[in-house]
Each structure stands twice: as structure tokens, then as C-alpha cells.
A protein has these predicted regions:
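Local sequence-structure signature of Cys/Sec-based thiol-disulfide redox active-site neighborhoods
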Residues: 2-56
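Beta-strand cores of modular interaction/reader domains in eukaryotic scaffold and signaling proteins
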Residues: 17-19, 49, 80-83, 91-92
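Short acidic, S/G/P-rich loop/turn micro-motifs used as interaction or catalytic elements
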Residues: 22-29, 88, 123-129
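Alpha-helical interaction elements in eukaryotic regulators
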Residues: 26-30, 57, 77, 92-99
Length: 131
């Protein structure tokens, strides 16, 4: 299965991609949380794409998106967050608390992610780029 053809998204520095599982109960919730960030940086005119897939497609799609050099959040055992910055540097942040501090510092926005929002065993990932 060629994920590249199926995805058909024009990736660019003005693009944010959110990847969620269709069978994940928090897909909509994750999207809403990231939308809060977008609301605060809407002057940057960032395009948003939401991609949902079933678990069987999830790893392949995630690997494809990672090759696009986008920032990546993986909420599995312990969150490891990679933020692709405008400069091209990839910043590694080790927890949701650190991610929240980063957002507060960069965008002066205090109501973004609360760690308890993601306390469950469901595998889920968000992929995004902050410019």
C-alpha cells in the first residue's frame, strides 16, 4: 500500500498535520487541543490537515509523515516530543509539561495541554510543525 499516494498533502512550512487513530477514543479531543494552539497563532496562516487511520495503517503512515521532517509527538509510554522550528533545528522535549512550557514561552499561551488529558493506555500520536 503506497501511503504517499493516499495521503496527498502538500507539506510546507505553513502546514500542521495531526495524525490520529480512527479507533482511538481521544482523536477528537487531541484535535481540539492542538486547535487551541492554532487559534493563538492564526496570524501565521498555518494550513491544518487532520489525518485519521485505523491501527493497521498507523505505523506506516506515521513513518511516512516522519520522513517529511515534521515535528512529532508520540503519546505512548512516556511522551517524547520533537518540535521542528523555523530555523530547521529539531528541539527535543521530554514531557507534556515541558511542551506546555515551550508553548507558553514561544506563544505566550497558558491554556494548552494538561498532562492528565492523556492519561490512558490508548496509543495515539499528533504530528505538527510550529513556525
Amino acid at each position: 500500500m503506497n501511503q504517499e499516494n493516499e495521503l496527498n498533502i502538500n507539506f510546507g512550512v505553513d502546514t500542521l498535520v495531526i495524525l490520529g487513530r480512527i479507533d482511538c477514543p481521544k482523536v477528537t479531543h487531541c484535535r481540539v487541543l492542538i486547535s487551541k494552539i492554532l487559534d493563538k497563532i492564526s496570524e501565521k496562516k498555518m494550513k491544518t490537515h487532520f489525518v485519521a487511520c485505523f491501527e493497521t495503517q498507523f505505523e506506516n503512515l506515521r513513518n511516512y509523515l516522519l520522513k517529511q521532517d515534521l515535528g512529532f509527538i508520540d503519546f505512548q509510554d512516556s511522551p517524547i516530543i520533537y518540535i521542528q522550528e523555523t530555523s530547521g533545528n529539531k528541539k527535543i522535549i521530554g514531557s507534556l509539561d515541558e511542551f506546555q512550557k515551550y508553548i507558553i514561552k514561544e506563544f505566550n499561551y497558558h491554556d494548552v495541554l494538561k498532562t492528565e488529558d492523556f492519561v490512558d493506555e490508548t496509543k495515539k500520536s499528533l504530528i505538527f510543525k510550529i513556525i
